[in-house]
Each structure stands twice: as C-alpha cells, then as structure tokens.
Design a protein with these regions (language model features):
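C-terminal and inter-domain tail/linker signature
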Residues: 1-135
Length: 135
C-alpha cells in the first residue's frame, strides 16, 4: 500500500473491471478479509491507496443482473494476482461487488504428479505482466 494516497476523481478501477458504473450507494466486499466498504466515493478512496497497481481483464461474463469477471493485477511488487469479481446490477449500475483473490503460490510437491499446468497465454484470460495497465 502506498503512503502517498492519491485524491480520487470518483472513477474506480472496479468500474473498469466490471465494464459498468458503480451506483452511488454500492457495497463492495472482500470475504477473505472480512471487509466491506460502502459508497462509490469510499471505494475510490480505498483504490487511491494503490497507485502502483496495474491490471487487465481477461474475461467478462454478463447474465441478466450479474456480471462475473476474471482479471489479473500486480500491486507493483512483481507478483501476479488472479482474481474474480462478481457484480450485482440494478438499472445498469453495480450495487454490490464481491472480490475474490489470493496470493500467488506454487503447487505443493505432493500435488504435482496429480495435476497438469494450466495453459495461461499472456494475452488470454489470465494476462501476464506485459499486458497489464494502469486504470
């Protein structure tokens, strides 16, 4: 996290990720941390603490009032986080957003003979570092 928080202009990365605007009263939650943030302004304020973050969307699926997005980010430390964001929609705006991600890990030795490597081309669903941008 940056100690030099940037002032938010109200735009959010999560709106880019979802491909649609956030409702003013949006609720964004991170279950793995047990956190929730309310309002688009506070979402933007939280995001402003990570100016080094780069990201790109790999796949976005929309079904009626739900959008599910697979995306990749780098917080500036060189590690690629693979994420899933679910947006619940009303009137073309996201009213509830749930983000899931975990730190990158290595396959445990015991599991290696049981699994194959996931094909992850750099310009595919899980972009590599060269395909990430600032938003």
């Amino acid at each position: 996290m940056s100690t030099n928080q940037q002032e938010s202009d109200g735009a959010t990365r999560v709106a880019y990720i979802l491909g649609m605007p956030l409702a003013e009263n949006v609720v964004r939650q991170w279950p793995q941390m047990g956190e929730i943030v309310r309002t688009s302004r506070l979402v933007a304020d939280v995001e402003g603490n990570f100016p080094e973050l780069t990201l790109e969307v790999g796949r976005r699926l929309q079904l009626d009032d739900v959008v599910v997005v697979e995306w990749t980010c780098d917080y500036g430390d060189g590690r690629l986080y693979r994420n899933v964001t679910i947006g619940e929609l009303e009137d073309g705006q996201a009213v509830r957003v749930t983000d899931y991600w975990g730190e990158p890990t290595v396959t445990p030795e015991w599991r290696q003979p049981l699994t194959d490597r996931l094909d992850m081309p750099g310009d595919g669903i899980w972009p590599n570092r060269e395909h990430l941008s600032h938003y």
